[in-house]
């Protein structure tokens, strides 16, 4: 062999780069099975690594990213939020009643209800995660509602008639007086989640446990309110103080309310007209909101994807990657980073020209991840020798497309590749000139020159060759072949046979390749094939037998909610012709499907609530009265989303679904009380006193629910962003619907009941 070839030991040419904080690494990724949980798997892996290190002290390893840490931190922040909600709820009860015993009564019902819910969750096979724990936080705010209503009613029956009524009788009578209301309110809250159990897709998978968890909480709280609260009331014998921290404010509000309602009942048309205008205005605000599939929580992780020109030597690529490393390491909020290119690292690019730099920010950083991301984008996307895209990573982003309100994505298809390539290049050129878009790229860009060999099947067949056989022989001559494997000192070493590097390094040398034929002769490659240079993209995608190109970009800070439509009309549409059409992108398609599913669930929930109302009041008229609180809630929901600039997402739509079941509770309390008072009072007096009497329990239940959601509405904790939309929708909706239930609902009650009143009552009201 040594007479005809050079034989030597060597190593394979470097075709990948992997570094952690500037040091070369070998990376191992561990993924859990579907039936395992991250925390258990993480502990097992850590124990295994410690065992290996004990066996070989020279082994050094670093845990680059442990997903279980993110889960643990998210669970911790949600658990802290739940504890805060319980404490604040008890404090609010003390403000209104002035007796710590009253707070303890309601506080006792909370852990009992939570434990019952956890038992039912275990029975259903649910796990504790961000979604289910968030539902427990929401449940804390709602599960005290029934207890507060019962407790407040017990206090009223104790003081009824000016004398002391035996505590036991007051507990029984007080509970019985509001029993129908709390059952109706609980049923309406629960039925809205029935559609969640029936829908499929991502919405059903994610939110079904949330819906069931809240239902479990509400059922447990209802049973607790009917049994535990009156029992504790008799046992503790709390006394409502006349001068509580909130009593003076409540008396002033009730007196002011009576005076205000006297005036509003005389201006029914103005009141109803104003309410309708506000609802219409809220719908206008809704059109100004952005949309996204799911909000990403702040996990402090940024993924930087760097695309280099195809064909670059790995040394040139490494220079670009080192520039990226130097840039991110200058950021004071960076904790560590991992870089991978080629087949190295956790993200294998499989020979493409892309590299991934995953940056992990410090836990005690002074800026949010989005702020760091925007700064890096501004600087890194100016680099001319590569294209850079950045995105923050979310714990919910695993296995799920997270549509973003700032993303641009257009998918064009055509049967003619050349037409599609030309159109995509022109679109990219136009978009790059616009001030409202940046980081524009096409999946057909970064084309690299290559040598293309088109084998003529007829000429090849005449020589006894097939195109496949020609390709195989040319590949072996250009790239070499592994002839055998030697075992040296227990190590397997491949023996590769190849021509010298300069044997076929020009197109002329390729054309001169001589191939053996099946007949024992030979033929030059140029005699059976056309050989020439051609620009080609890294990959060509086809969909339904059509060529496909994806054009992506990012909206700038100056863009608004109408920018996407403008780009569509001003740029994209004019390139759509008979041969080129546009497909709905994956994110938009998924978002539309999930939004449609949740929209149907909301519509079904509204119908189910109406059915429950009709069954409870045995009158469509009273059901319609209660249902008016739902459109009123939209005023606050859309206003809060607009003020915080929170996009409409799956979680915010879930908030609207929950709102359907919660806002009607105040309406139920008011209508039920007004109907009871009409039996003993003048019609006008009954309408006004029903609101004045129910003002305190309405405020208490609304406050406890709202306060429980405030940490989520403020995006508190690592997982705060995930459920912020839901909390904002419910907080805003509850605030406005409570005010509307006290101010507008009495007017609507009079309008709906006016035809059934005798002349004296109508005159008295007007």
Where are these regions (language model features)?
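Hydrophobic transmembrane alpha-helices and their membrane-interface caps
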Residues: 87-156, 611-694, 699-716, 732, ...
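Signature of alpha-helical transmembrane segments and their immediate interfacial
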Residues: 176-178, 231, 245-295, 382
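Extracytoplasmic/periplasmic membrane-proximal domains and adjacent transmembrane bundles
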Residues: 1-85, 94, 151, 168, ...
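Solvent-exposed, membrane-proximal periplasmic/extracellular interface segments of envelope transport
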Residues: 316-404, 459-478
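Transmembrane helices with small-residue packing motifs
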Residues: 122-123, 197-205, 276-312, 366, ...
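Extracytoplasmic/periplasmic
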Residues: 292-362, 417-450
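Transmembrane alpha-helices and their membrane-interface boundaries in multi-pass membrane transporters
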Residues: 139-154, 178-198, 205-244, 357, ...
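Helix-loop junctions and hydrophobic alpha-helical segments within the transmembrane domains
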Residues: 64, 71, 75, 151, ...
């Amino acid at each position: 062999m040594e007479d005809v070839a050079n034989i030597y030991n060597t190593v394979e040419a470097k075709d990948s780069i992997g570094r952690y904080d500037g040091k070369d690494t070998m990376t191992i990724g561990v993924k859990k099975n579907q039936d395992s949980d991250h925390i258990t798997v993480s502990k097992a892996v850590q124990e295994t690594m410690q065992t290996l290190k004990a066996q070989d002290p020279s082994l050094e390893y670093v845990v680059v990213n442990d997903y279980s840490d993110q889960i643990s931190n998210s669970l911790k922040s949600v658990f802290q939020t739940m504890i805060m909600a319980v404490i604040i709820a008890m404090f609010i009860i003390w403000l209104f009643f002035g007796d710590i015993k009253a707070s303890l009564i309601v506080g006792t019902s909370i852990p009992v209800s939570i434990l019952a819910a956890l038992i039912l969750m275990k029975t259903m096979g649910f796990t504790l995660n961000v979604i289910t724990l968030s539902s427990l936080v929401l449940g804390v705010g709602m599960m005290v509602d029934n207890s507060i209503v019962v407790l407040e009613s017990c206090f009223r029956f104790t003081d009824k008639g000016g004398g002391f009524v035996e505590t036991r009788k007051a507990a029984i009578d007080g509970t019985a007086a509001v029993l129908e209301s709390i059952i109706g309110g609980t049923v309406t809250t629960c039925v809205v989640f029935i559609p969640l159990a029936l829908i499929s897709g991502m919405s059903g998978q994610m939110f079904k446990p949330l819906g069931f968890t809240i239902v479990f909480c509400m059922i447990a709280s209802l049973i607790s309110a009917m049994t535990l609260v009156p029992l504790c009331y008799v046992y503790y014998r709390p006394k409502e103080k006349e001068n509580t921290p909130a009593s003076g404010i409540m008396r002033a509000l009730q007196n002011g309310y009576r005076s205000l309602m006297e005036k509003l009942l005389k201006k029914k048309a103005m009141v109803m007209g104003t309410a309708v205008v506000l609802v219409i205005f809220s719908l206008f605000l809704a059109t100004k909101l952005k949309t996204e599939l799911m909000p990403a929580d702040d996990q402090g992780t940024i993924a930087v994807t760097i695309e280099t020109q195809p064909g670059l030597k790995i040394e040139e690529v490494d220079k670009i990657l080192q520039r990226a490393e130097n840039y991110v390491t200058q950021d004071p909020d960076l904790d560590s980073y991992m870089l991978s290119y080629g087949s190295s690292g956790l993200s294998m690019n499989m020979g493409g020209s892309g590299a991934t730099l995953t940056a992990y920010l410090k836990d005690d950083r002074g800026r949010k991840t989005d702020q760091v991301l925007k700064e890096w984008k501004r600087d890194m996307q100016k680099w001319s020798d590569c294209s850079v895209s950045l995105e923050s990573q979310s714990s919910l982003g695993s296995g799920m497309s997270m549509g973003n309100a700032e993303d641009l994505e257009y998918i064009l298809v055509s049967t003619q590749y050349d037409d599609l390539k030309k159109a995509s290049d022109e679109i990219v050129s136009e978009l790059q000139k616009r001030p409202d878009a940046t980081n524009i790229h096409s999946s057909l860009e970064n084309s690299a020159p290559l040598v293309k060999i088109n084998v003529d099947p007829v000429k090849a067949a005449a020589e006894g060759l097939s195109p496949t056989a020609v390709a195989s022989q040319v590949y072996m001559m250009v790239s070499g072949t592994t002839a055998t494997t030697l075992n040296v000192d227990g190590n397997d070493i491949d023996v590769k046979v190849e021509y010298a590097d300069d044997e076929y390094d020009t197109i002329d040398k390729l054309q001169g390749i001589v191939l053996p034929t099946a007949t024992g002769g030979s033929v030059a490659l140029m005699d059976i094939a056309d050989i020439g240079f051609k620009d080609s993209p890294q990959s060509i995608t086809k969909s339904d037998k059509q060529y496909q190109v994806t054009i992506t970009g990012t909206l700038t800070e100056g863009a608004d909610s109408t920018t996407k439509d403008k780009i569509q009309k001003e740029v994209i549409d004019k390139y759509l012709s008979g041969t080129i059409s546009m497909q709905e992108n994956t994110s938009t398609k998924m978002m539309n499907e999930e939004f449609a599913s949740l929209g149907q669930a909301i519509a079904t929930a509204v119908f189910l609530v109406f059915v429950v109302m009709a069954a409870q009041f045995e009158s469509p008229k009273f059901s319609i009265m209660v249902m008016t609180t739902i459109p009123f809630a939209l005023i606050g929901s859309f206003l809060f989303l607009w003020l915080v600039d929170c996009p409409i997402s799956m979680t915010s739509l879930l908030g609207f679904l929950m709102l359907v079941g919660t806002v009607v509770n105040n309406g139920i309390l008011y209508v039920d009380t007004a109907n009871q008072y009409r039996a003993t009072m003048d019609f006008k007096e009954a309408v006004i006193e029903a609101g004045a009497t129910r003002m305190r329990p309405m405020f208490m239940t609304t406050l406890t629910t709202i306060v429980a959601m405030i940490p989520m509405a403020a995006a508190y904790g690592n997982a705060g962003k995930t459920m912020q939309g839901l909390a904002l929708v419910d907080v805003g909706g509850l605030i406005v619907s409570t005010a509307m239930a006290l101010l507008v609902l009495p007017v609507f009650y009079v309008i709906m009941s006016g035809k059934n009143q005798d002349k004296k009552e109508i005159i008295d009201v007007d």
